[in-house]
Amino acid sequence: MTRTTRIDTQEATKHKDLPPVPSPLSLSSNPNPECLMESKSLGRKNFKKLSLDASPVKSTSGSLRSSDMMSIKEPTSLRQKRQRPPPILHLPTASSSATSTPTSNITGSSSASSIQFAQKSPGSGVIVSQTLSRPSSAGGIPSSGYSSLNVNQSNRNVDPDNVVSTDMILNQISNLDLTSMNHHRQHYQNSHHHLPTTNRKRQTVISSISPTKSSAASSPLEPQIQSLPASSQSPIATTSALKLNNKDLLTLKQLGSGNSGSVSKILHIPTQKTMAKKIIHIDSKSVIQTQIIRELRILHECHSPYIIEFYGACLNNNNTIVICMEYCNCGSLDKILPLCENKQFPTFVLKKLSFAILSGLTYLYTTHKIIHRDIKPNNVLMTHKGEFKLCDFGVSRELTNSLAMADTFVGTSMYMSPERIQGLDYGVKSDVWSTGLMLIELASGVPVWSEDDNNNDDDEDDEDDAYVRQGSIAAERNGQNSPSRSRKNKQKGNGYNSYNGPEGILDLLQRIVNEDAPTLTNKINPVTKLPYDKYLCQFIDLCLIKDDSVRKTPWQLLEDKEHFFKGVEEGVYDKEHKSWAKKIRKCKV
């Protein structure tokens, strides 16, 4: 042992920069921990000196006890942070109040309406209940039906498939059980009648169109009308999932315009939803404006796959109405007709179209007692999927006339029924007449009242018919036209022929009332040189019965499942129809 120590000492003297290696004898003679650390660090100056002052209690002998070493643990804050449970947000489901057990705790002992938020104290693991109170009415009426929410919000621990937005939380807070609250409030006032009470009015925001659904008890023709806000612009109607404001509407392109209105394609920026916006100039009379707003409220409650969806409307201070509705990317039928092969609608498309129009008319009348009053190609739209939808229908003459102001009176009167022109009482059967006239135009490619009664086959007649089929402006005639030929002058207009001057308008109205109803029976298609479909001709003849007492209603016509509408509901023509609609969409682009 002595020799080994001597050899180590000699080896250490060779390196003068390092202190000698301590021997076991020196360690045993100096048991001080500081000396021990100094000896093990070899006395290096850059070695960080460890302080053992903050260590656990030393023993009397100066050495550390093993029990004290086990008591050295990490800080409490880190331990609590690691042991904190993930946040939990308890929200009642939509059906929890009626059928299922509610997930929220009902608190009825508080004197004010409150919502409890559970949080952890930063210093300990105890959960502290924090309450956000609402001011209650005087008298300390207890509240009930409020939800207890645990909102230790942390996006890391929220299930992305079950994310609850802030709007939903606000809706849960605002849509409280007012009936239960009023019952408890009344019971508390009866038992504490000596306490002073203060009547508080609940403030409600009224939009220009009510978003509520119509009930069977109240008639849609007699809605509850609220007073309009006194502002330069009435607010746009809102639905449960969509809120419209003028500042959120971005115009993409103009779809059409007229003397009294325009239609444009817009984008609703918050939802990135494409819509169609129609601006219509109306009368400045407040009575008419109020009537139009009332009707727009009713239109907002119409929900059918055959009716254009109505998003909302607002009344501007410059006597214009802005209507936001569903956008159909294929446009109206008068714009689709020139894109069709031979400028005629195929028979299977006419079957789908007739079924959609009659179904839409049936829904409007049976559910809301609404008559369209303006069935024509301009007011029937089609989507890229081949869905046909009715638009621009009203409840009264004020709205119907306002919506039709962009078109000429002749264009609308061409499709009027005889009883309506004569000023007689008319109903939904008047729309059936208009449907029959429109089917003739779409099947033949020629407006209904363009042919002369005498059926003259001279070159001038053929030339006029060719101009009508091509949708171009009629050629100018040299010299004076005879009175019998004045009604043969055509204009491109909005896809139909118009009669120039008051005499032409009166001539048109007299023809509708006095002449026989138009028909395709026993006629040859000028393009295919073949007769028209037999069932199509029979269906059109049923629609164009001049005596409205004999003419069928839309739902009566839909009952014929064995002839014209055979296979329509079963989807026999769906594949062929969708392929045709896809071609039309490509032509539009």
Swiss-Prot record:
Compositional bias (Basic residues) at which positions?
A: 185-203
Q: What class of enzyme is it?
A: transferase
Q: Where does ATP bind?
A: L255, G256, S257, G258, N259, S260, G261, S262, V263, K278
UniProt domain Protein kinase: residue ranges: 249-565
Alphabetical keyword list = ATP-binding, Kinase, Nucleotide-binding, Phosphoprotein, Serine/threonine-protein kinase, Transferase
Where Phosphothreonine occurs, residue numbers? T408
Concerning InterPro entries, the annotation shows: Byr1-like_cat, Kinase-like_dom_sf, MAP_kinase_kinase, Prot_kinase_dom, Protein_kinase_ATP_BS, Ser/Thr_kinase_AS
EC number assigned by the record: 2.7.12.2
The keyword Nucleotide-binding is annotated on this UniProt entry: yes
Positions modified as Phosphoserine?
S402
Using the chain's own numbering, where are the disulfide bonds? none
Family matches, as PROSITE patterns: PROTEIN_KINASE_ATP, PROTEIN_KINASE_DOM, PROTEIN_KINASE_ST
- What's a single GO BP term from this record? filamentous growth
Q: Where is the composition biased (Basic and acidic residues)?
A: 1-18
The terms under GO molecular function for this entry are: ATP binding; MAP kinase kinase activity; protein serine kinase activity; protein serine/threonine kinase activity; protein tyrosine kinase activity
Catalysed reaction equations from the record? L-seryl-[protein] + ATP = O-phospho-L-seryl-[protein] + ADP + H(+); L-threonyl-[protein] + ATP = O-phospho-L-threonyl-[protein] + ADP + H(+); L-tyrosyl-[protein] + ATP = O-phospho-L-tyrosyl-[protein] + ADP + H(+)
Family under the similarity heading: Belongs to the protein kinase superfamily. STE Ser/Thr protein kinase family. MAP kinase kinase subfamily.
Q: What is this protein called?
A: Serine/threonine-protein kinase STE7 homolog
